[in-house]
């Protein structure tokens, strides 16, 4: 163990280097200039880290920054979490019992651990990783330990420009989310009544009926919900009941559903998401979510990846990725119905940076409402807007803890909830030991995609 005096922005501190005690070949560290530290990982079995500490102001905010230049022996094998920066928050060491809500955190200093986010760029043969994130100081914590850790792939990392700054506490980033619930049953009754009267219900007429239901719901929402940020409707509402849904597949932007969303998005300055049968420029049909932003512009399209047999036998073509959309309040992803029974789907959306999931579907069963959808929110640590087409099951909003925070069963009704996308939900233990961790970050920062991608579906049978 090597101890070197150094300095962080807010306080004089001590830097200490450690190598994992069970490693066959030890990692090494040295100070190569004032405030510049080198970490060398010699082999697959090595792990080493530099650590230092700083005082913080309870109740305030702290911005952590650092630049790390990483030279690796084999760049193709280097993955996102081979080199990381994390912070460990400590309570005052005064012996007080600060156990909260039975989470097991009590007598002792360690309270919480967080990874610091980073951005990468290439500089010749090196990777330059810039860490930069601002946190709210948790509870009564008055100090923080900062660790830079390298592991498992041979590398030499140079750590410089480490800054720990007391700043204002981060403000909430509240988003007013609404899920509309039109024509759960009523839409089909209207169509049936017109057919009984002898009226020929073409695809275009059916779409007009259903879009009328959606517009009725939009009118209800804007009459009662002040300043919504985003509204979601359920799967393929506009073609429900059409004799041949593919015949009324529409261009996005430009089709009837788009024009309705554009009208209300611009009038009320609200992001509106709908799920439609889309016909693309090549003539192929997709099951598609689109988001129309507050200015009436297309923010993004998601095409359903996991199709049902009924869909592909109809001629629907699947999407081939999980894009996310940058809106004015944050980054949003989407999945459609059957997609969300595959846990990989929401993890891919999360891996692409989504902070909120749009999830329209045609229908499901009660146990899916009770277990599957909350589990997906917990899996990825992101909230979900659920727009259902069945009146006996809820449309609503699930927070990142997997709790339904709003529901509606009403035709042309709505569910509304204000979500704080800056709210860092913590859970006891996870991988951090006897302390609190943030699932939203941990499930990404400690995942092993390089292992998962070795799966060969050709050799695997159920």
Regions found by a protein language model. Give the residues of each.
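Extracellular and organelle-lumenal recognition/adhesion modules and their flexible linkers in secreted
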Residues: 7-170
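C-terminal beta-strand edge segments of enzyme domains
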Residues: 125-130, 200, 324, 388-462
């Amino acid at each position: 163990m090597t101890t070197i005096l150094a300095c962080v922005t807010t306080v004089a501190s001590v830097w200490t280097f450690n190598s994992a005690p069970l490693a066959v070949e030890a990692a090494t560290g040295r100070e190569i200039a004032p405030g510049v530290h080198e970490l060398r990982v010699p082999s697959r079995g090595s792990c080493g880290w530099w650590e230092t500490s700083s005082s913080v102001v309870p109740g305030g905010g702290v911005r952590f920054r650092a630049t790390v230049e990483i030279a690796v022996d084999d760049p193709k094998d280097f993955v996102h979490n081979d080199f990381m920066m994390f912070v460990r928050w400590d309570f005052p060491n005064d012996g007080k019992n600060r156990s909260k809500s039975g989470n097991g955190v009590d007598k002792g200093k360690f309270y919480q651990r967080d990874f610091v986010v980073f951005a990468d760029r290439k500089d010749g043969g090196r990777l330059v990783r810039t860490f930069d994130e601002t946190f709210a100081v948790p509870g009564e914590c008055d100090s923080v330990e900062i660790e830079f850790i390298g592991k498992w792939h041979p590398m030499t990392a140079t750590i410089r420009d480490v800054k720990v700054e007391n700043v204002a506490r981060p403000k909430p980033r509240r988003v007013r989310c609404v899920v509309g619930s039109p024509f759960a049953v009523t839409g089909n009754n209207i169509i049936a009544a017109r057919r009984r009267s002898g009226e020929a219900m073409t695809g275009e007429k059916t779409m007009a009926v259903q879009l009328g239901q959606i517009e009725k719901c939009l009118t209800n929402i804007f009459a009662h919900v002040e300043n919504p940020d985003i509204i979601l409707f359920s799967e393929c509402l506009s073609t429900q009941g059409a004799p041949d849904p593919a015949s009324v597949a529409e261009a996005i932007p430009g089709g009837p559903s788009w024009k309705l969303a554009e009208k209300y998005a611009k009038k009320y300055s609200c992001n509106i998401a709908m799920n439609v049968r889309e016909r693309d420029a090549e003539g192929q049909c997709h099951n598609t979510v689109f988001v129309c932003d507050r200015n009436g512009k297309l923010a993004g399209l998601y095409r359903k990846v996991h199709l049902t047999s009924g869909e592909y036998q109809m001629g629907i073509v699947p999407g081939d990725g999980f894009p996310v959309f940058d809106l004015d309040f944050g980054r949003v992803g989407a999945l459609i119905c059957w997609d969300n029974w595959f846990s990989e789907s929401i993890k891919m959306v999360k891996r692409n940076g989504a902070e909120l999931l749009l999830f329209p579907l045609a229908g499901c069963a009660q146990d899916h409402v009770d277990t599957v959808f909350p589990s997906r929110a917990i899996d990825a640590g992101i909230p979900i807007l659920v727009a259902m087409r069945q009146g006996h099951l809820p449309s609503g909003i699930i927070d990142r803890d997997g709790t339904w925070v709003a529901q509606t069963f009403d035709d042309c009704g709505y569910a509304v909830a204000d979500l704080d996308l800056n709210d860092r939900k913590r859970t006891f233990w996870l991988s951090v030991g006897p302390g609190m961790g943030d699932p939203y970050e941990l499930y990404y920062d400690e995942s092993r995609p390089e292992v998962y991608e070795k799966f060969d579906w050709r050799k695997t049978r159920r």
